[in-house]
Amino acid sequence: MEINGFKLKYSAEELTKKVNNEVREICLIDKNEKEYVDLTDGDKKALDYLVNAAKIMNDVALELDHPLNLIQKQALETLAPGNEYVSNALLLFNFINGVAGYNGLDKDPVEIFEGIHMYKGCNFYPTDLDENEFHEIIIKMLDENKVDEVAKILSSRTVVRRKGDVLEAIDYTEYFSEEFSEIANEIECAAHFTTDNMFKEYLKWQAQALLQNNVEMDILADKHWVKMQNTSLEFTISRENYNDKMTPSVFSNKSLIERLRGVNINPVPKDMLGIRVGIVNKQGTNLLLKFKDKMRELVNKMPCSELYEQKISDGELKQTMVDVDIVALSGDYAMCRGGITLAQNLPNNDKPSLYRGGGRRNVYHRQVRFAGDSEKTKKILINIILKF
C-alpha cells in the first residue's frame, strides 16, 4: 500500500507483531485521577493550556526531525479509520514519533516507509548536504570572513538552509515564529490561571523566551525553572541535542576545528525540542528530598565506592528534585527510540544558564517508572549486586 507515493515497508502481519510485542504502553495521568481532582480550578485550567502548548511543540519537533514527518502523519491519520493495516502503521509512527528511528534493539532503524530514511543532520540541515560538502562550505565561508554567519550555523538553536553556494542559519524563533507565538500564547494563558506565583513567574519568562531571538531570555527562563521546588505543576521545554550528527562532524576534521577555535566558535549540536507537562507528586517528591539530604551517606554505600572518585560537593547541592505524574510528553520526549527516560536532569552542560550561576532540576517520571516490570528489574539488580 502506498501513502503519498511511499509504500509501507512492513506487511500487515509484521506491523501487528511490532505494535503488539515490541512496544511498551505507558498510561499517563488523566482528569479522573485523584492527583488532577485535587488541583485548584485555576491550576486545572492552566494544565489544559499547557497540554495545548505541548501538542503544538510536537509538530515543531516533527519538522526538525524529518521533512516528511508531518505530511506522512497527516496521511496516516486520514486513512487509519476502518483500516487496521494503516492504523497499526500510525501506531508505530506515534511510538517513535516519526517516519523512522532506532528501537534500541536492532542495528538498523525502524523505517515505516520504503525509501524514507533518517538523515545525519535530521531536518536541521538540508537533506542533500553530506558531511564533506558541509565542511567545504564552512571552510569557504571562513575564507570569506563570514565568521558570524558560521557561528550561527554551528549554534544549537538554528535551522540551516542553502543560500546560493553557502549556508544560511535561521534562529528557531524566526523559523517557527508562527508556532512559537501560538505556544507562547498558551503558556501566557496558563500563567494567568495558575494559582502558584512562582510557577506563574516562570511561565511568563518562558513565554517571552519563545518570542525573542535572544539566548539571554532562555537563560532567564532556565534559572526560574530550576528554582521550582514547591510548585503544584510541572512544565518543561526540553532542549536536548543528541539527534544531530552533522554539527559534531566538524570535530573529526582537525584543521577545521582548529580554525573554528581560532575565531572563538564552539560548535554545539542542534537542540531537538519537546514539552513535558505534569502534576508534582508531593509524597514522591518528599521521599526524593530525603535521599538528597542523605546523598553523601548513600554514595559510600554504593558497590565498589572505593574505586571511583566522588563528585558530591561539600556545600548544599544546587539542585531541585521533583517526582511528577505525567500528563503529556511531546516532541523529543515522545521520540521513544530505544527507550524512554525515567528521569531527566536539566539543563545540560552546553546550556549557558549552567555556567551563569544557574543550577539543575531533576524531574522523575512516575508513570514511566510504574510501567516497568518490577520483578524483572529486581532480578537484574540482584544479579548486579551479586557480582560484587
Where does each model-flagged region fall?
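N-terminal helix-rich structural modules
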Residues: 2-206
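Catalytic Zn2+-binding segment of zinc metalloproteases
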Residues: 388
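Contiguous, non-catalytic segments that form substrate-binding/exosite surfaces or channel walls
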Residues: 175-385
